[in-house]
């Protein structure tokens, strides 16, 4: 039996993959996958194991001037995942916006344009 959760109109597995560590270190998480192919392999392994929710954000990036790094990585992994169109249709990629980074600083940017790209 697979546990699922509803996110809006979507039903996904109860366990998702938080992709932030694939792009940036934190105070609790000092490591980062330096190898892009290894990071993509992690995402592929999660999808192959049945994970249907990938969590990303434009602020998940190795540095202040590489915003969008994680979203690009997740998109590349999703596109290169060898799955059927039916399997791909079940995947939800959740992203967030509204936080921006300047050199050495994080700040809020809660304006509609930040969601439009």
Residue positions per predicted region:
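Active-site mouth loops of central-metabolism enzymes
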Residues: 23-37, 101-117
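Active-site beta->alpha loop and helix N-cap motifs at the rims of alpha/beta catalytic domains
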Residues: 97-99
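N-terminal binding-site loop/beta-alpha segment at the start of enzyme catalytic domains
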Residues: 1-92
């Amino acid at each position: 039996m697979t546990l699922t959760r509803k996110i809006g109109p979507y039903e996904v597995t109860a366990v998702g993959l938080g992709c932030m560590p694939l792009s940036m270190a934190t105070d609790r998480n000092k490591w980062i996958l330096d190898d892009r192919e290894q990071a993509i392999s992690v995402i592929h392994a999660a999808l192959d194991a049945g994970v249907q929710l990938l969590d990303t954000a434009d602020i998940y990036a190795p540095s202040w001037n590489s915003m969008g790094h994680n979203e690009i990585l997740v998109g590349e992994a999703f596109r290169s995942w060898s799955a059927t169109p039916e399997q791909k249709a079940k995947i939800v990629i959740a992203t967030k916006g509204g936080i921006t980074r300047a050199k050495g600083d994080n700040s809020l940017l809660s304006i509609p344009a930040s969601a439009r790209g």
